[in-house]
């Protein structure tokens, strides 16, 4: 009994003891972020490439036996990983997709050959930006009435991105922008008609707008990528609607930002009739949920906020929009309802706002006179602009949009608030006659904000007229032609002047003036020029009149035009023969000429034709109808042939000639002409007879010849008399009348005087030179044209030392001889005696004595000699 177990049990007991000593292997738990261990809290990006070594299973056996690794999945799941049983390296064998499978469940096991330890692990698949935005509710087809107001919301596109974070946020823009038609809200995807855009069903029944949805970007395979998607919004322009309304693009979401102004559009709901053939129009209305904060445009479905965002009490508004069809008869039809969610978004941004005296205002009007002074301020405009933001967000620029260069705005840059001043830049462009209304837009646009919010206000200036224009004639000159026989008071022409000013300033009064205006009058209002009632016009006296017409407004501003009036000649004068036509003398073989004049001013009224109306006999003379020359017929070549024509053998013939003008009606005058016919032989025998015969036709010719002969005789007489007068005057100048030369008191003999003159000839000659031309003296006292030189009282004659008998008291000794005393006037000698006396003396000696005498007299006058 005290012995051990039986021997047969010993091997089994040994085996059991050995089995109990072999412990199971286990994994190492290295925690999150480790790439080896038991895959606890292991995550893997979904963009990991297939075949990548992503993890290493790591474990151990307490006995140090080698271990092997295994991984398995649910039968319904994919086998995503494979493992190296010896090394434990896990390799990705299938692509991951977080959006399809964001976690993977697997069973990993470790075995030492005897023991197998298995664990269930969950591998998290992390996001990568591998999903592009995807539009939902495609296709986008919008039915828009062609009368939809510009700026209205017409559709909303919506795209979702299954990525997370910024890679899942979506913004919208137009790929092919339509700057004149559509725009899209970058946050909400609301598609709107641009301001000023108009849809026209007849021009385009459909518009295709490409909208791009772009995510916020993220990592994909180690690189930053931004993915996008596009969709096409088909905007069908509707003409009519008639089926039950159906909302398009539900659900509806809208956003009201802090800077949204009351009356701004938030979003637009769209409903259309299912009957596209001839649809009825629909009307929108808000059923409940707005609390007076929102209104909907009953025709476009545009929902607008009516209160300032600061006055809104809730963050989210759930509105119910009802659409009602209206039949062609105007009665309500089918209805539909849709919920609309509007969220209030808090942003610190306000657009600039214009204020008038009574509050916010977007239209300002002013009346002012045209052409104000340059630099004048438009004080009638009270405009204030304000931006409620702070700092850089409240800085904006001001400018005027409209016809350039007329006005400028001050200031041009504003921070928060400013008083707007508009100043005149171009006074000439502010013209009532060019434009009665000037319209500008005052634009305020932010400077440093990405949104560039702006606002506009209309500035309308009504111009008032002033008298700034001068009446202007339609032409600088006017030309008129009237017949000279026009009666008094006849209309001549009408002048027209236009004054573009309005009212009384535009009324024009006419007047005429000038040297040629005496015979004319002008109507002060109509500008009609007519002749004076008493005027008698005569083209022969004055054929042309020229004067000025004046157009003047009520304040005296005027302009001038020149008027030229030409009188048209009328045949109102008879041809008139001269007096010499009554009798003519014809030399055989030479024609005689008659001449008549017509006082009319113009041709053909003053052109005269000549004819012989009566002659006895009628076959003797011919006449040139144009020149009036009369000659004997070619058959009559001698006086004998002429005498044989009549029994009496007359040499004097009587003709009745006629002068007739070419006017219409024509006037004529007749005259009786006597022609004396002589032969050339008779004239050659007696020149005086020839002359008298020639002057018989023209007595004034003889008078002219006699007057010419008398004129020649008179001219010769005057020429001889003038020559004689100047010769006597020159000779008498050297013999002054009643002048006595007083001798010097020096007792020097005359011989000394002569020697002094002889040896100092050069110096004495200088003294004889006359420094200043003396006036002509009246030596003969026979001319009243010259004034005699002043004379001193005549002193007694100086005593003469022993005058010799017969010596003349007026003798003056000279170098070459003595001067003869002046002889008293005696009766004029006969020409022969004068010639004999002139021949006595030498001409050379007489000339020399005369010259020395003249020089001596000038010398004595220069030395102030006593007389």
Curated annotation (Swiss-Prot):
Compartments, as annotated in UniProt: Cell membrane
Enumerate the glycosylated residues.
Answer: 58, 89, 288, 297
Q: Which residues form the Cadherin domain?
A: 36-135, 136-247, 248-354, 360-473, 474-577, 574-689
- One Pfam family recorded for the sequence: Cadherin
Q: Which GO terms describe its cellular component?
A: adherens junction; catenin complex
Hey, which stretches end up on the Extracellular side?
A: 22-701
Q: Where is the composition biased (Polar residues)?
A: 777-786
Annotated source species:
Bos taurus (Bovine)
UniProt subunit comment? Interacts with PROM1.
Which gene carries the instructions for this protein?
Answer: CDHR1
Q: Which InterPro entries match?
A: Cadherin (IPR039808), Cadherin-like_dom (IPR002126), Cadherin-like_sf (IPR015919), Cadherin_CS (IPR020894)
Residue ranges of the TM segments: 702-722
Tell me a GO biological process for this protein: adherens junction organization
Would you tell me the protein name for this molecule?
Cadherin-related family member 1
């Amino acid at each position: 009994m005290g012995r051990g177990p039986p021997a047969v049990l010993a091997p089994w007991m040994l085996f059991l003891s050995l089995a109990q000593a072999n412990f199971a292997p286990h994994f190492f738990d290295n925690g999150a972020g480790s790439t080896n261990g038991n895959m606890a809290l292991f995550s893997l990006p979904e963009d990991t490439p297939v075949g990548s070594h992503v993890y290493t299973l790591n474990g151990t056996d307490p006995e140090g036996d080698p271990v092997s690794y295994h991984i398995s999945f649910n039968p319904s799941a994919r086998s995503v990983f494979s493992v190296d049983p010896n090394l434990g390296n896990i390799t990705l064998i299938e692509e991951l997709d977080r959006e399809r499978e964001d976690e993977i469940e697997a069973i990993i096991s470790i075995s030492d050959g005897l023991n197998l330890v298995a664990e269930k692990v969950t591998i998290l698949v992390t996001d990568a930006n591998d999903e592009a935005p995807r539009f939902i509710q495609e296709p986008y087809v919008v039915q828009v009435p062609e009368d939809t107001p510009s700026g209205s919301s017409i559709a909303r596109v919506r795209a979702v991105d299954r990525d997370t974070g910024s890679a899942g946020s979506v913004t919208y823009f137009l790929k092919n922008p339509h700057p004149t038609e559509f725009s899209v809200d970058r946050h909400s995807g609301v598609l709107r008609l641009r301001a000023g855009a108009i849809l026209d069903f007849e021009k385009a029944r459909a518009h295709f707008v490409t909208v791009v949805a772009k995510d916020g970007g993220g990592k994909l395979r180690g690189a930053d990528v931004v993915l996008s998607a596009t969709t096409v919004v088909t905007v069908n322009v509707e003409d009519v609607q008639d089926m039950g309304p159906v909302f398009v693009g539900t659900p509806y979401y809208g956003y009201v930002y802090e800077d949204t102004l009351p009356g701004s559009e938030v979003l637009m709901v769209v409903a259309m009739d299912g009957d596209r053939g001839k649809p009825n129009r629909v009307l929108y209305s808000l059923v409940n949920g707005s609390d007076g904060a929102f209104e909907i445009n009953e025709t476009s479905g545009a929902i607008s906020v009516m209160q300032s965002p600061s006055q809104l009490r809730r963050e989210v508004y759930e509105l119910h929009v009802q659409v009602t069809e209206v039949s062609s008869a105007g009665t309500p039809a089918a209805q539909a309802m849709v919920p609309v969610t509007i969220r209030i978004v808090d942003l610190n941004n306000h657009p600039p706002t214009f204020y008038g005296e009574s509050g916010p205002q977007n239209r300002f009007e002013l009346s002012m006179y045209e052409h104000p002074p340059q630099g004048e301020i438009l004080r009638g405009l009270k405009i204030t602009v304000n931006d409620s933001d702070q700092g850089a967000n409240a800085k904006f620029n001001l400018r005027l949009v409209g016809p350039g260069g007329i006005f400028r705005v001050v200031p041009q840059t504003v921070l928060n608030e400013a008083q707007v001043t508009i100043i005149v830049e171009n006074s000439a462009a502010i013209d009532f006659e060019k434009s009665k209304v000037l319209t500008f837009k005052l634009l305020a646009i932010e400077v440093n904000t990405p949104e560039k919010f702006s606002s506009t206000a209309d500035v309308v200036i009504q111009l008032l007229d002033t008298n700034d224009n001068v009446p202007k004639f339609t032409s600088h000159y006017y030309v008129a032609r009237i017949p000279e026989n026009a009666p008094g008071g006849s209309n001549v022409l009408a002048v027209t002047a236009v004054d573009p000013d309005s009212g009384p300033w535009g009324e024009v009064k006419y007047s005429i003036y000038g040297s040629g205006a005496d015979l004319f009058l002008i109507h002060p209002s109509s500008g009609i020029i007519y002749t004076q009632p008493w005027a008698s016009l005569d083209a022969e006296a004055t054929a042309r009149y020229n004067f000025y017409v004046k157009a003047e407004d009520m304040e005296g501003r005027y302009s001038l035009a020149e008027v030229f009036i030409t009188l048209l000649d009328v045949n109102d004068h008879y041809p008139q023969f001269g007096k010499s036509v009554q009798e003519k003398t014809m030399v055989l073989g030479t024609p005689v000429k008659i001449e008549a004049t017509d006082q009319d001013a113009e041709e053909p009224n003053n052109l005269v034709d000549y004819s012989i109306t009566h002659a006895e006999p009628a076959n003797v003379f011919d006449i040139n109808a144009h020149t009036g020359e009369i000659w004997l017929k070619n058959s009559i070549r001698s006086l004998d042939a002429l005498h044989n024509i009549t029994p009496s053998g007359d040499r004097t013939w009587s003709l009745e000639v006629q002068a007739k003008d070419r006017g219409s009606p024509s006037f004529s005058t007749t005259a009786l002409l006597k022609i004396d016919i002589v032969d050339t032989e008779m004239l050659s025998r007696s020149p005086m007879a020839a002359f008298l015969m020639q002057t018989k036709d023209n007595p004034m010719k003889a008078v002219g010849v006699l007057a010419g002969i008398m004129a020649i005789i008179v001219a010769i007489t005057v020429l001889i008399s003038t020559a004689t007068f100047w010769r006597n005057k020159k000779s008498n100048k050297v013999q002054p009348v009643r002048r006595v030369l007083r001798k010097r008191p020096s007792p020097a003999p005359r011989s000394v005087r002569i020697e002094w003159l002889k040896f100092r000839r050069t110096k004495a000659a200088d003294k004889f030179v006359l420094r200043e031309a003396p006036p002509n003296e009246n030596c003969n006292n026979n001319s009243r044209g010259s004034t005699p030189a002043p004379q001193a009282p005549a002193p007694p004659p100086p005593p003469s030392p022993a005058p010799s008998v017969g010596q003349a008291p007026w003798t003056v000794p000279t170098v070459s001889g003595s001067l003869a005393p002046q002889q008293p006037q005696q009766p004029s000698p006969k020409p022969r005696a004068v010639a004999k006396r002139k021949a006595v003396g030498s001409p050379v000696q007489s000339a020399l004595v005369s010259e020395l005498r003249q020089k001596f007299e000038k010398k004595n006058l220069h030395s102030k000699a006593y007389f």
